[in-house]
A protein has these predicted regions:
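C-terminal, well-structured catalytic/ligand-binding subdomain of enzymes
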Residues: 1, 5-7, 14-134
Length: 134
């Protein structure tokens, strides 16, 4: 349903506001939505987003700090795990790339297609992983 809406309509946010969305289904397919920019459907082993645009990186490049390589770092770590990747591995990556301070990461999510569940951590408290089962 969401994919059909995206094909028929342009999704936008209010002026001077931006946000990405990642939607996933029980088959592990993901849809990355960047309002005003576009969308991408992923069917690989993982899908990854960060604070800057994945679909049009040049649009957010002026706002990215030179040392902010979290997307690239997480992508490399994901590739190292290969076929042996668990929810705990995902959280170890998220912990390695989380932000602290004024722009601290507030929520980190991991969706397990195998379990049809979303795991989450709030405010970088990686010692307390919550779980929501569908």
């Amino acid at each position: 349903d969401v994919l059909q809406i995206l094909k028929e309509r342009k999704i936008v946010y209010a002026a001077d506001a931006t946000m990405q969305a990642m939607l996933s289904d029980k088959h592990g397919r993901t849809l990355v939505v960047e309002p005003g920019i576009g969308w991408r459907e992923d069917e690989g082993r993982y899908s990854l987003i960060t604070n800057y645009s994945i679909l049009a990186p040049e649009s957010t490049r002026p706002f990215v700090m030179p040392e902010d390589d979290r997307y690239e770092k997480a992508s490399k770590m994901l590739n190292i795990y290969g076929n042996h990747f668990t929810v705990n591995n995902a959280f170890s990556i998220l912990q390695a790339v989380c932000q602290e301070g004024i722009w601290a990461t507030r929520v980190s999510f991991v969706y397990s297609a195998e379990e049809n569940a979303v795991y989450y951590v709030q405010n970088n408290n990686f010692s307390q992983i919550g779980k929501y089962e569908f």
